[in-house]
């Protein structure tokens, strides 16, 4: 068994008790009075992933600079990963860009709720509500959701945490990793531009001077390029893979427990296909994302993961493809397309 890194030990010391406290709170017998709901399903999964009598399995963390093969997750800096990517380095493990300085003012819950109201105050938003019996997200008026978030989740009192997974990015400049500006990572934006020109009959390299109307064809790839996420403390999302390909997510505030399946052999993936987000792998490892951390999940790889929110959190993220692995990415896309149960989002129609 490889020796644990200092970073792994520090993470377990810093967050192990916090995670266990949240799990005990979720297991409170009072919550069983809610009947059969999404919350009950989530508790069943959490109890299987993290049995009460075991320590939290923190991932083996290693520096990307050493290309440590025995690490579950690489950690790096913005400068180091940008330099490596410029030399055609291929990322093959989940990687965290550590504690970026976001350079933003007004961060926090109030700022987020004000932005949500400014953008969508008279609209509806998709909400994962664990107090319902439906797996599908519930469409709720934004004003009601804002009120519920302001009230705050209180698991012992029966106010269960909600999850907003289908938000547009609310801002001007998303905090994407700088290396994504390299030409090899321009695959999805280029596809989007080409297909938009094909479907509209207007191949114009510039801003549109008029509204775009597309008949009988949905233009939906852009929605994958950037997105925003919000979840309250205790919100849980079961195991899934991201579609269409690689993902980056930056934690703007809060705390997230990211849980990875460590054994993705053929028999486990068959179970995953059959069970979807009810699947629990034989073994897992986890990391805690802190404010400013950016998690990058590599292109062309199937990385089943689940997420538990440790503190009210907002994330910004996006999707990308790597031209150096484009054939493998297409294989991944095809694999997901015939196994839709493994992803919590549909493949953009423009890629089908």
Task: Name what the model sees in each region.
Residues 1-296, 304-352:
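N-terminal accessory scaffold of Fe(II)-dependent oxygenases
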């Amino acid at each position: 068994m490889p020796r644990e890194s200092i970073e792994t030990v520090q993470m377990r010391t810093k967050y192990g008790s916090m995670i266990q406290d949240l799990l005990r709170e979720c297991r409170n017998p009072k919550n069983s009075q809610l009947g059969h709901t999404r919350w009950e399903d989530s508790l069943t999964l959490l109890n299987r992933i993290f049995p009460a009598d075991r320590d939290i399995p923190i991932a083996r963390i290693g520096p990307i600079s050493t290309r440590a093969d025995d690490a579950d997750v690489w950690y790096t800096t913005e400068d180091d990963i940008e330099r490596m990517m410029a030399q055609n380095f291929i990322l093959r493990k989940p990687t965290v860009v550590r504690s970026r300085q976001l350079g933003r003012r007004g961060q926090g819950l109030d700022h987020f709720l004000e932005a949500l109201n400014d953008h969508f105050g008279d609209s509806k938003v998709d909400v994962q509500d664990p107090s319902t019996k439906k797996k599908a997200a519930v469409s709720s008026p934004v004003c009601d959701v804002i009120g519920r978030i302001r009230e705050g989740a209180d698991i012992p009192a029966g106010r269960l945490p909600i999850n907003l997974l289908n938000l547009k990015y609310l801002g001007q400049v998303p905090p994407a990793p700088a290396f994504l500006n390299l030409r090899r990572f321009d695959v999805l934006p280029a596809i989007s531009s080409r297909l938009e020109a094909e479907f509209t009959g207007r191949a114009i390299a510039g801003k549109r001077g008029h509204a775009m109307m597309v008949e009988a064809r949905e233009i939906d790839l852009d929605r994958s390029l950037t997105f925003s996420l919000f979840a309250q403390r205790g919100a849980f999302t079961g195991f899934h893979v991201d579609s269409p390909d690689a993902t980056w997510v930056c934690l703007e505030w809060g705390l997230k427990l990211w849980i990875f399946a460590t054994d993705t052999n053929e028999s486990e993936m068959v179970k995953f296909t059959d069970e979807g987000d009810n699947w629990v792998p034989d073994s897992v490892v986890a990391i805690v994302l802190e404010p400013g951390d950016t998690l990058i999940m590599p292109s062309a790889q199937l990385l089943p993961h689940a997420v538990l929110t440790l503190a009210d959190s907002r994330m910004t993220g996006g999707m990308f493809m790597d031209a150096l692995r484009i054939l493998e990415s297409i294989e991944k896309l095809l694999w997901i397309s015939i196994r839709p149960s493994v992803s919590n989002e549909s493949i953009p129609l423009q890629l089908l």
